[in-house]
A protein has these predicted regions:
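Terminal accessory/targeting
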Residues: 1-8, 15-76, 80, 90-225
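Conserved short loop/turn motifs at secondary-structure junctions
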Residues: 84-87
Length: 225
């Protein structure tokens, strides 16, 4: 995909948890190398709290590096690194390892006090004044989706962006059998939600709002260290 469309961002979504009911998966490393990261079935834990309780930061470091190395081995030239469920915020030790990946691989990592706070953990010992952070982050809430106002949220976000760098987090996909199966019993961030994301950000309405509000689209390569 990157070879055919090199102008787009292709990041690595580091994954240490798996919330899905039927679409279960685990680490890329052998289980014997990272036993603290998995449940009795060899799958990642469903919740950040479980990761916080059981995971070894040394094993997390090994797994995160393995995921990045594997992606690069497959030919990906990553524009940035972020984290599924922002599970890297599960502890200061884990977050320290995550931040160090930026210097090791010379790839920007997503650091945000707001995302950290959303996990329920305190960032005070993890994010420092010298860290480059992105705080103008916009993401629809469960309430927006459940009240049928997710589309409206995105419209309002584009109409009220603050000056500077803004990041809108979305999960675009089709509301098809595959996505319904993956997200079964998980309506929040489920297939219907993802289809709304896809529909809005490919719509003429979105394009018009970008133009009307003089929003310049940038990518992670513009922020590359």
């Amino acid at each position: 995909m990157q070879k055919k469309n090199p102008k787009y961002d292709y990041g690595i979504h580091l994954t240490l948890t798996c919330e899905w009911e039927k679409h279960r998966f685990g680490p890329v490393l052998p289980l014997s190398e990272v036993p603290s990261l998995v449940d009795e079935n060899g799958h990642f834990f469903k919740k950040r709290e479980q990761l916080h309780k059981h995971a070894s930061s040394a094993e997390i470091e090994k797994e995160m590096k393995a995921q990045i190395d594997l992606a690069i081995q497959y030919g990906l030239q990553p524009s940035h690194i972020d984290s599924h469920m922002y599970s890297v915020a599960s502890s200061p030790a884990i977050f320290k390892v995550y931040k160090e990946l930026e210097n090791k691989y010379h790839i920007p990592v997503l650091i945000s006090k707001n995302l950290y706070k959303n996990t329920g953990y305190d960032f005070i010992n993890s994010i420092h004044e010298t860290d480059l952070t992105l705080e103008q982050i916009h993401m629809g809430t469960f309430k927006d989706f459940e009240s049928g106002k997710l589309w409206e949220f995105y419209e309002n976000a584009l109409q009220n962006l603050e000056e500077g760098i803004n990041l809108i987090l979305t999960h675009p996909a089709f509301d098809d059998d595959e996505m319904k199966s993956i997200t079964i019993n998980h309506p929040n961030f489920g297939s219907k939600w993802r289809k709304i994301d896809y529909d809005f950000f490919t719509s003429n309405r979105c394009k018009a709002l970008l133009k009307e509000n003089e929003i310049e689209l940038v990518d992670w390569r513009d922020l590359k260290i």
